[in-house]
């Protein structure tokens, strides 16, 4: 099976220039593909697929516009993948799965440099470095994290990305799937929430990391740095003396703080999932949360976004597949919080402010733990 590994790299200055050029070219080609298809649509012409666009770009457009010859200097596979990403975005729009594709803006969009293994010498990986096409050998900061070629592992493809002045490589490695699952323990239910991040039916509670003193301090620092950046932009608009280099420095400070906060949240999710999976349950049941609907509530949207529920579900599903654990998804309309775990009665007048569930049968329990118990014993579900 294929497994992904992502780690930070330490490229040289020359390699950094190549990464910046390739990512910039990929962003330009992606935007050009969107703009060209919009123009074709306005003229009443047929939609151009990624294959037709590449033929038209190489055989017609670049020969007529030599000023864009710098496009050919970038790694060809990365450029091809950016066009394919554009077609995927249109396909999702045509299938009513997402909104109309948006242009990618420099510094604000997640654009990556894609690479693939074309010959045996490409994508070789050693303990402390990896060979990336068009870049050569690049040093890895976390030594030994990616399985090495010497041990018989094969890197199929990967991407190089940049975030807050730090560079990362993500690779797909072909590994053998020979794990024998030993999940003899009872199943568990997990209720996700805002007061606490996750409540497990076995009584374990994972606190909301966003309420920790460390994150609160970082968020206050982020507000101060954002305010400072806004003042610099305002001074620039007014015509006052403000060096653009100082704006870029301040912008980088803000990006690094965003990145640090995001890394803390992601690390907490990874550790939570690892701890849950180590208990070796026979199955795990979670609720299909309507995150998009929750985000529409302006009072809760920030708190919901910071919890990263979708990332938790995605990573939990991957870990369950790797360890042979059945992941059950209960419908979002299942009244897990309002149902009494003791007698099965539904308390329709339960409010969000009611933190203790009290039933007429005499059953009293924390509402989140009651929901986790109901999810564990749910009969109607789908296997992810």
Task: Briefly describe each language-model feature range.
Residues 33, 78, 82-93, 369-379, ...:
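Stable alpha-helical structural segments in soluble proteins, enriched in small hydrophobic residues
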Residues 4-8, 137, 157, 187:
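Well-ordered beta-strand positions in beta-sheet-rich domains
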Residues 3, 148-151, 163-384:
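Positively charged, helix-rich recognition surfaces that bind polyanionic ligands
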Residues 6-8, 85, 129, 168-170, ...:
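Beta-strand secondary-structure signal
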Residues 34-41, 90, 94-101, 175:
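Long, hydrophobic, amphipathic alpha-helical segments used as structural scaffolds
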Residues 52-163:
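Acidic carboxylate diad motif detector
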Residues 1-79:
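Gly/serine-rich nucleotide phosphate-binding loop at the start of the catalytic core
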